């Protein structure tokens, strides 16, 4: 089997990670004690991707929980599925990172990282054929962003040929915990560009807007935001967990989705959107699902796809539906909106269908888009970064941990380069592709 080792780092990472395990355990018929009570062979066919089978037919998540303070992990442990995790896989410090990327990456986090890597090794050794790692973390804090990116680069060193996939929560001024979020996020993106194969950008701003506008929740809590994240993560990993036609393992997904190595930041989407506790009573049709799925209001990253163009798209439909109808609808979207798909990658939309719908829905659709409009998100963070960095505000917290201003300047320019790369491919057309490559050659010279 092709196993995936899951790592969750920091407060946000542990909260969305715990939620993810609740949702997929439920989908696979696994109760909080790790016993199977399902009703379909499909639930067990690829259970080994995310679970170890222990003695007594207990299924244990291949999950590693990491944090620099014990608080969040205590609440995971006492949460609904807290007892399903392997106790040795909780790795935590006592000091906390204080929302400081430098503490997570260079000082506090660096002290803890070896004990995390021991657990990673142990999990990887119990795998038959490890396909890769997935990390849930946020980019705004200290542990998930600083230590999360440190773990990525260490794991990259040790397992260079394995896929590294992250679910990264981007900070937003609308749901802000700290003033230094733009610093932490920029320093993290600097690492993610170089060291991951696939990054799902989950943006608090977009989640907030969905809760507020679409779900009509007046004061959305993190619980409501995490409900959306877990629905999306469940959808995105469907192809990895259930037998399907487009049997995406992480590597096949990367091959389909990433045309240029640096441009691996995906915009996830989900339809139909429902709030916690209220499920829709009307089954949606395939055309409605398709239409909703491509709508900017359903995107989990606060970017409007109409402001850019899609390099590649993957769509995952779940539930009993006609494959023919799905294919027709997907072609329909592409034909009607052809200007929003780059014409120099033909057939850049791939579709998978899985028979098992998520709990409480007859059918659902998950969207993964590699769109040049994601640059809006990086621009937003970059502007906030520059505003503070120009005045060297709050820098002493970072230099005090041994960082150099140079690193900030490098991270800033790497992020700006990323934005211009997206822009360059947005403007590229099929016929000028030749000239375009010559220019690239000159730049490098």
Curated annotation (Swiss-Prot):
Its cofactor is Mg(2+). The modification Phosphoserine is found at residues 40, 172. SMART domains: Tubulin (SM00864), Tubulin_C (SM00865). The modification N6-acetyllysine is found at residue 58. Mg(2+) binds at residue 69. Some glutamate residues at the C-terminus are polyglycylated, resulting in polyglycine chains on the gamma-carboxyl group. Glycylation is mainly limited to tubulin incorporated into axonemes (cilia and flagella) whereas glutamylation is prevalent in neuronal cells, centrioles, axonemes, and the mitotic spindle. Both modifications can coexist on the same protein on adjacent residues, and lowering polyglycylation levels increases polyglutamylation, and reciprocally. The precise function of polyglycylation is still unclear. Some glutamate residues at the C-terminus are polyglutamylated, resulting in polyglutamate chains on the gamma-carboxyl group. Polyglutamylation plays a key role in microtubule severing by spastin (SPAST). SPAST preferentially recognizes and acts on microtubules decorated with short polyglutamate tails: severing activity by SPAST increases as the number of glutamates per tubulin rises from one to eight, but decreases beyond this glutamylation threshold. One of its GO terms (biological process) is mitotic cell cycle. Residues 422-445 are annotated as: Disordered. The modification Phosphothreonine is found at residues 55, 285, 290. InterPro entries: Beta-tubulin_BS (IPR013838), Beta_tubulin (IPR002453), Tub_FtsZ_C (IPR008280), Tubulin (IPR000217), Tubulin/FtsZ-like_C (IPR037103), Tubulin/FtsZ_2-layer-sand-dom (IPR018316), Tubulin/FtsZ_GTPase_sf (IPR036525), Tubulin_C (IPR023123). Tubulin is the major constituent of microtubules, a cylinder consisting of laterally associated linear protofilaments composed of alpha- and beta-tubulin heterodimers. Microtubules grow by the addition of GTP-tubulin dimers to the microtubule end, where a stabilizing cap forms. Below the cap, tubulin dimers are in GDP-bound state, owing to GTPase activity of alpha-tubulin. Implicated in neuronal migration. This is Tubulin beta-2B chain. The gene is TUBB2B.
């Amino acid at each position: 089997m092709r196993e995936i080792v899951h790592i969750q780092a920091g407060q946000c990472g542990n909260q969305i990670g715990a939620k993810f395990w609740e949702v997929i355990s439920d989908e696979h018929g696994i109760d909080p004690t790790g016993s199977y009570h399902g009703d379909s062979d499909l639930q067990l066919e690829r259970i080994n991707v995310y679970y170890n089978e222990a003695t007594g037919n207990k299924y244990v998540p291949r999950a590693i929980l990491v944090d620099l303070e014990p608080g969040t992990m205590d609440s995971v442990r006492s949460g609904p599925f807290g007892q399903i995790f392997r106790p040795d896989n909780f790795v935590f410090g006592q000091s906390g990172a204080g929302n400081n990327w430098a503490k997570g990456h260079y000082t506090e986090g660096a002290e803890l990282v070896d004990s995390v890597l021991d657990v990673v090794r142990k999990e990887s050794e119990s795998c038959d054929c490890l396909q890769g790692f997935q990390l849930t973390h946020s980019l705004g804090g200290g542990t998930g962003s600083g230590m999360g990116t440190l773990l990525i680069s260490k794991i990259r060193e040790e397992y260079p040929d394995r896929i590294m996939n992250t679910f990264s929560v981007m900070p937003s001024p609308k749901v802000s915990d700290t003033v230094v979020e733009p610093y932490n996020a920029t320093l993290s993106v600097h690492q993610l560009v170089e060291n991951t194969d696939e990054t799902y950008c989950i943006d608090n701003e977009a989640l907030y807007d969905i809760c507020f506008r679409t779900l009509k929740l007046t004061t959305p809590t993190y619980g409501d935001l995490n409900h959306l994240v877990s629905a999306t993560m469940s959808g995105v990993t469907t192809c990895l967990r259930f037998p399907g036609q487009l049997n995406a393992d992480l590597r096949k997904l990367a091959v389909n989705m990433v045309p240029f190595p640096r441009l691996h930041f995906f915009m996830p989407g989900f339809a139909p959107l429902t709030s916690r506790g209220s499920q829709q009573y009307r089954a949606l049709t395939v055309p409605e699902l398709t239409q909703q799925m491509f709508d900017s209001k359903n995107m989990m990253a606060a970017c409007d796809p109409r402001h850019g163009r899609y390099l590649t798209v993957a769509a995952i439909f779940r539930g009993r539906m006609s494959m023919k109808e799905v294919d027709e609808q997907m072609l329909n979207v592409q034909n009607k909106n052809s200007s929003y798909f780059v014409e120099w990658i033909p057939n850049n939309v791939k579709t998978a269908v899985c028979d098992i719908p998520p709990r409480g829905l007859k059918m659902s659709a998950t969207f993964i888009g590699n769109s040049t409009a994601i640059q809006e998100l990086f621009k937003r963070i970059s502007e906030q970064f520059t505003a503070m960095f120009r005045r060297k505000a709050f820098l002493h917290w970072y230099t005090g941990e041994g960082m150099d201003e140079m690193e900030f300047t490098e991270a800033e320019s790497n992020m700006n380069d990323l934005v211009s790369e997206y822009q360059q491919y947005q403007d590229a057309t099929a016929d000028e592709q030749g000239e375009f490559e010559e220019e690239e050659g000159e730049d490098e010279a």
